[in-house]
């Protein structure tokens, strides 16, 4: 939350686990991003990972007295921020993230830190480590419905032709 109210920014993130089993999430954003001004050392933060989600039509239930809804799965990482402003640490953060995302490339891109333009760009970002204190899983996939409604919903999602809806059907646990 900033002075102008709640803020949300979609960021590149990387989950890391140390030898003791502690999770942290490395992330970065532009210093010019208004959200960066409200993020500080020791502040609490939440990283949201939205999973499969989608509109659920009342037509898809066996019972006909329903309204539309939204089914979803999500995971929240809740923790404390540590600001990363040191150039060397920022370069390591970018390197780790790049290595992870370029892993499948035939000729993976690597930062040339001797290039002044690339170095200037890394100094235009601010990094953070979110030390995860707890994880929360959230899901709403029809688990509160009757077995008949769940089976009907699952069948309609599977037959939708939409890969996202078909995956949502796989997330459902039918009684």
Segments predicted by a language model, with ranges:
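Short beta-strand segments
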Residues: 1-31
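A short, structural micro-pattern
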Residues: 7, 21, 41-42, 69-73, ...
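A general structural signal for short secondary-structure junctions and capping/turn motifs
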Residues: 17, 37-39, 118-123
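Short loop segments at secondary-structure junctions
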Residues: 18, 52, 80, 133-135
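An N-terminal domain-start capping segment
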Residues: 25-47, 158-163, 170-173
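Beta-strand secondary-structure signal
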Residues: 26, 46, 78, 127-131
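Short, structured beta-strand-loop surface elements
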Residues: 31-93
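C-terminal edge-of-domain segments
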Residues: 82-175
